């Protein structure tokens, strides 16, 4: 949520104030500026997540100790996987980081396409909260699980996320293929983050191209 609040006005605020008209006139006001903003936003989101994750891990180790977190998670669905609590913690942190990347890129794409930072933030918060609503409204539905896991915020919902899905041990099917839900949660943001980042860059450059005055051909 904090990353979305920070990234929502990255492009949209300049559209609404007209500052982008000035930036387009600069030497590096197009592709390089767009790439720099994308990189800065992704870096800031990464730093914020690492800090929060570090605090979470420190509190977890302080409360439960290393012996507790290294014990094997002996659930029926995970016996064959031989996953320890340390492994669960690593997977949870990895899924969270990937989802932060995907949500940041998604927010930047919306910001590059919309003029209102408030509208961008509203859409982003709705997407961020959707997995929580889906887990409540469509708990036993495979369609609900697919939607929840394929959203950029699939690994960040309240009451959902990697830690919960590992314990539940659900599988989603595509024909005769059964896929463990944590695998979907890890794979989806890996694809979505670069796609939305490229779309954001493309939307920003195309918006600038559309705003530039066209030269009339000389007869």
Regions found by a protein language model. Give the residues of each.
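Transmembrane helix irregularities
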Residues: 26, 113-114
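Membrane-helix interface/capping residues of multi-pass secondary transporters
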Residues: 30, 116-117
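Secretory targeting signals
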Residues: 1-14, 35-113, 157-180
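Transmembrane helix boundary and interhelical loop/hinge segments in multi-pass membrane proteins
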Residues: 7-22, 26, 30
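Transmembrane alpha-helix boundary/hinge residues in polytopic small-molecule transporters
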Residues: 18-19, 105, 121
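Short, flexible loop/turn elements at secondary-structure junctions
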Residues: 26-28, 37, 202-203
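Terminal transmembrane helical anchor/hairpin motif
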Residues: 66-87, 118-122, 127-216
